[in-house]
Amino acid sequence: MRKQDEEILGTYFRLEEYQKQRLRFERLLHPEQFKWSGPTPTMSATKKIKLAELEKIGFGESFYRRMADGEKAARKELEDLAENHPLWEYIKPIRGFAKYLAGAFIAAGGDIERPATASAFWKGMGLDVLADGTVPRRTRGDKQTTRRIPAFPHVTRIGEQIRQQMLRQNPCYQELYHRHKADYQARYPERPKMFAHKHGLRIAQKILYAALWEKWRQACGLPAPFPYVFDILKHDSGRRFTIEDFYSKPG
């Protein structure tokens, strides 16, 4: 793995751990900072005892403050690293893709030297399909999803963050989502609407990731061939989607 990408991955893991601990103790020490469906829970006698014991072993207010400060510092470090990454110049114009999300995406992508094709990159990012072309998903009666090598948990979490942000803010991503969602509903009208929703999200994300994979490889001086034409990567005009399609248009 390239040293710059390794630094980003390490910083992301540190940020994630700071955030996890901060949220854990924020819920215990400062429940008023959360949005509750009802009134803020009161401090029970049991919780008071728990907090007192946690304080004795160093997990009190001072620990919470350290985690909150560490989270802010790690986030700033991740954003700075992302801004100095060669992929940033291609990500910067994408509406909905701020510096934090760019750093998180690079952390999820990991070693860009390994996936020599867009489909290999999709697999590492948890967007692969099974041999029959279906999406890995649980079926009733099965305990595990059929997938040879599942994506890392942090890759899945980052993918969800990217989907949410892009669907809210990026016009090209929104258009791709709605188009492929409608196409799925037309082909499988008997299936649950959630399947169509997830299909639209998945295809839009695969198109975005393929474009980012190409620029990332090229920015690092690596070949980025498309050995065959992916139908879903085609624009209405017949050309393949590129990262520029996701850029904010003037006016």
Region annotations inferred by a language model:
Residues 169-251:
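Acidic, carboxylate-rich catalytic segments that either coordinate divalent cations
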Residues 41-49, 79-91, 143, 243-250:
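Long, contiguous secondary-structure blocks with strong helical propensity
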Residues 72-110:
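Coiled-coil termination/hinge junctions
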Residues 1-81:
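Long, charge-rich intrinsically disordered scaffolds of nucleic-acid metabolism proteins
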Residues 7-27, 31, 103-108, 157-165, ...:
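Short, hydrophobic/amphipathic alpha-helical patches that form generic packing surfaces
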Residues 90-93, 104-198, 202, 215:
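Phosphate-backbone recognition surface of nucleic-acid-processing proteins
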Residues 13, 55-58, 62, 69, ...:
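Alpha-helix boundary/N-cap detector
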Residues 34, 77-84, 217-224:
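Surface-exposed helix-capping loop/turn segments at secondary-structure junctions
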